[in-house]
């Protein structure tokens, strides 16, 4: 398979098609946007500074694939990705989260992403070090028989020095190799050992009120290097010790300065921030009440989207080349209700169409992570073969679409509630049913949902 940087916009859309049904225009827009970033990397330095990403505004009802398109794109490109709700933020001066925190969160995600990649590279070495530490606990050297040599040396060293004969050392090595063999064969997984772990005392957490969590984390990180690291002995099984020690040993092998440098570069040049519910901060604000800082949030958001420098605990981060994708249903407000400067920062606008009954049929069947495939995989662990007929799938799609028309339109999310209700009985009885092949047809779907769908009040609560 091609690396992401070699993929054409058409190929990116084809990859997104594996997970998201329809919405071609939105897929096309994001594919062009990320491809332009790759093109920008190939430009000479003077041109690279001039080319800024074209941010995208997605307009469409809930459950049509806005978030999923952005999330899958980030996974595909290996970009640091952060999803935030615009309603989470408040204007500077009000209690709540400032918009700057989204950049700090993105950098944190980027650092963790690069760190995990580097840990994977040194995993083999780390496993060898973990094996040695477990063997140290299983066969401590102190258990070898000491030989008293010079009493004057013992007097000076407080009796702590132990001398071993060559025979003792040979016996110790043989015992250690014997235990190594058993360890590699998995014979000692349930053996209990005592290992020493470092713990940093954190006296600052928990003293900061709501909206000040960031400050608490920053102060804790600032003092973490100065705080004493306490060593604590813990008893655990070998299998558990391996899980605990592996990340600790791997971290010792990686250069954190290089990790941070690469993570900052990745966040600045490849980062994607998805701002959901942007329509909720659009419109005229009131002088009092919960909407008092709507326009203030937009004004605070403006410099970040335009391009500014935000200080993080890892260093300054420029936001000029971060791709921002904003999304909203815009049922009550319109994109023109956003402040003009912010509108200008989202030049690419795509409208996602509401899902039809036929789209629902495709969503149930086609994506690689399709709902019915998920249930088939889950129940196969109990030895149950779940078979969906074409008319059964169409009946589920029809009922979900009908409920969306009658009740609140929640898009494809309605399919999850319908599928869950249809398969509730099978999921409950799966381990005990004698007939391990279950066929879900239209009749079966109607039988499971008939009463609920007919009762308006009941369907409003259950589906």
Curated annotation (Swiss-Prot):
SMART domains: AAA (SM00382), ClpB_D2-small (SM01086). ATP binds at residues 21, 63-68, 276, 341, 413. Keywords: ATP-binding, Chaperone, Cytoplasm, Nucleotide-binding, Stress response. Gene3D superfamilies: 1.10.8.60, P-loop containing nucleotide triphosphate hydrolases. The keyword Cytoplasm applies. GO terms for molecular function: ATP binding; ATP hydrolysis activity; peptidase activity; proteasome-activating activity. It is found in: Cytoplasm. GO terms for cellular component: HslUV protease complex. ATPase subunit of a proteasome-like degradation complex; this subunit has chaperone activity. The binding of ATP and its subsequent hydrolysis by HslU are essential for unfolding of protein substrates subsequently hydrolyzed by HslV. HslU recognizes the N-terminal part of its protein substrates and unfolds these before they are guided to HslV for hydrolysis. NCBIfam families: hslU, PRK05201.1. Belongs to the ClpX chaperone family. HslU subfamily. A double ring-shaped homohexamer of HslV is capped on each side by a ring-shaped HslU homohexamer. The assembly of the HslU/HslV complex is dependent on binding of ATP. This is ATP-dependent protease ATPase subunit HslU. It comes from Thermotoga petrophila (strain ATCC BAA-488 / DSM 13995 / JCM 10881 / RKU-1). The gene is hslU.
